[in-house]
Swiss-Prot record:
This phospholipase A2 inhibitor binds directly phospholipase A2 in the presence or absence of calcium. Pfam families: Lectin_C. Residues 46-161 form the C-type lectin domain. Its main location: secreted. GO terms for molecular function: carbohydrate binding; phospholipase A2 inhibitor activity. This is Phospholipase A2 inhibitor clone 11. It is found in: Secreted. Residues 1-19 form the signal peptide. PROSITE patterns: C_TYPE_LECTIN_1, C_TYPE_LECTIN_2. Homotrimer; non-covalently linked. Keywords: Calcium, Disulfide bond, Glycoprotein, Lectin, Phospholipase A2 inhibitor, Secreted, Signal. It comes from Bothrops neuwiedi (Neuwied's lancehead). Belongs to the alpha-type phospholipase A2 inhibitor family. Disulfide bonds join C83-C160, C138-C152.
Length: 166
């Protein structure tokens, strides 16, 4: 009997000496800490990768804003909802290089798209004879980036604007 008891104590001592604790709460806590550290490393890697891609796209267009299409054709209200659901915005180029980046998307797809023009815009790119309120209350850009008055019911290429200031 003493031999069995001594063997049990010896085995328990070996487990404790190896750090294999019997406490399941402690094991769970250590496991959660390891998982959290792994997630933190993965997040840092993803953030770094995202920033590299964003900087590369910004470098190529000369704009800190990205203009992205899902290739759908929709009216202004549908565009507003789609961009909002995607955490984006209806395009609103504020600088010439932003308008060029926006126009590049339109040229690539051979389509026109809506944009919004602020009341205090420092940059505009109205086509000759525009804005023309008789043509409509909305604004569209052609494949060259020129702006035209348009009906908000026109079905145009869906393009949303995304900008990331980190």
């Amino acid at each position: 009997m003493r031999l069995i008891l001594l063997s049990g104590l010896l085995l328990l001592g070996i487990f404790l000496a190896n750090g294999d604790e019997v406490d399941p709460d402690r094991k769970l806590l250590n496991s959660l800490i390891d998982a959290l550290m792994h997630l933190q490393r993965e997040f840092a890697n993803l953030k770094g990768s995202f920033l590299i891609v964003h900087k590369a796209r910004s470098f190529g267009s000369g704009s800190e804003r990205m203009y992205v299409t899902n290739k759908e054709i929709k009216n202004f209200e549908a565009l507003r909802q789609i961009c909002e659901q995607a955490d984006g915005h209806i395009p609103s180029p504020q600088l010439e290089n932003q308008n060029k980046a926006f126009a590049n998307v339109l040229e690539r797809h051979g389509k026109e798209a809506y944009l919004v023009v602020g009341d205090s815009a420092n940059f505009t790119n109205w086509a000759a004879g525009e804005p023309n309120k008789a043509a409509g209350a909305c604004v569209k850009a052609d494949t060259h980036g020129s702006w035209h008055s348009a009906s908000c019911d026109d079905n145009l290429l869906v393009v949303c604007e995304f900008y990331f200031i980190l």
